[in-house]
Structures are given as structure tokens and as C-alpha cells.
Amino acid sequence: MKRLSLFAATVWAALTLAGCAGTKAPVPTLEAWNDFYPGDVHLTDRSPETRGSQIWHAIVPNPEAYIQGCAREVLHTLYTSPADTVVPHLREIRYRLEDYGGISEKSGGGDHVRIRYSTRWVERCFGNDGDTARVDHETRGVLYHELTHAYQLEPKGCGSYGDGGEYWSFIEGMADAVRLSCGGFEQDFASSDRPRGGHWSKGYRHAGYFLYWLNQNKGNDFLRRFHRSAAELPVWSWDAAMHHVLGPGEQHSVEALWREYQQAVGDSEEQPVTE
């Protein structure tokens, strides 16, 4: 019995090494999504008189192609291929420009989603120097984040968005990890875009850069597999998801991986853990 258990453990470890930690899986191509229809795009501009609206339209002359192109990038980052059975199919993306004090938000659900984007924020990004590249970078980045909310899986058995717990940190952490992976944040860990210290449970960029680092260092399909764990685990948690993707062992607990990440990017005085 002991010999059989040892054999099973050895086989499992070999499969884990082959498919997970630190190895390079075949990278699915973005072109595989060219024929996937991400949904009809309907643009509403509620503040056409604002400078922000005029700047946005100058940068985005073809809103449908712009939004659908970003949607395909998001889908490519979240899922292995259009044939994946858990890929959601949206019928409609309603995108609204509006002069308000926030930045952006996604609402709706199922196969109809709504995204609101602030023309006031566009003006702020444009600045006095008229930096259209900055506006485009920010507009794409925000759109990647909101479209992730439209297409991402939702974990089960771990609370709700409103309680600010593991469900919330997964939802917002994945959205910023996808934004980062698509180039919507600076991918250099020394960049000012990356928050220093903190904790993965803070979601957003804290979790986003952590997940991006794991994808770079624990297998280049880590992010897709971590995301898919939301569909595969009946009771989801960050710790359970890490073990689900990377295997058993204390070194694969979320706290151990967070410490390893913090050490690797220079946010901890401790030496990096080596496996």
C-alpha cells in the first residue's frame, strides 16, 4: 500500500512539474479568437458637449472594433480557446460615455452588460499637455478591467462581492491581472503602477501583480488555470485555488506564495524561497 501511494505521489508530482510550476505550456494565440463574436456593441454618449467626449471620439474612431478587439484580448487572457465549454457568450455590450465623478463601472449580467466611462476622467488623463497616448492607454486599461468583469467566472461558496472577502478579492484581482497581462498597466515590477507591500486580500493591483508574477514564474498558463478553478472547485478559496493549480505542500499555500512574491520583487528583506 505504501509503495502504491509512493508511486501515485511520484506520478502526480511529475504531472505537476510538467504542467504547472515554472514550465512553459504551449501558448494559445490571440488569432484563435478572431472568429469569436464577443457581442453587439451599442455606444451611448450622454455628454457629447464635453471636452472628454470629443477627445474620446478622436482616439476611438471605430468604437465597435475598439471594444470588440479589447474583448477578444480579455477572452484570450482568461480562457484557453473559444472551444472552452465555460466561455460565456454575450449578446450585447452597452458602452456609455458620461460626465460624472467616477472613472468606470460595469453593471448588468448574463448576456447583457453595461459599461459606463467618465468623460471627466478622459479630460484628466489628457491633461494640459494633450497626451493622447496616455488617454488611449488608460481607456484601454479601464476597458480591459471592466470587460474582465463581463466575461470572468465567479467562485462558489466564498461569500459575496459586498462582504469584501475572498470572492471580492478574486473578482477585482483577476480584473487587474487581466488588465496588466494585456498591457493596461506597466508590466515592470519596479513600475509605480505596482503597489508596494500590502496583501493579496486587498484585491485590485495588489492581487493583480501577484497573479501576474505567478503566471510568469509558476507556469505561463497559471492565470487561466487559476481563473478556471472558480468553475472547478465547489467551495472556492485563494488557498484551495493555489493548491488546485500548483499542487499540495505548504510552499503552495497562498501566504507562502505571497511571501515568495514579495521577496522576489524586493518588498521583503527576507531571501526568496527556492523549491
Explain the meaning of each model-derived region.
Residues 35-61:
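Acidic/histidine-rich, surface-exposed loop or edge segments in extracytoplasmic proteins
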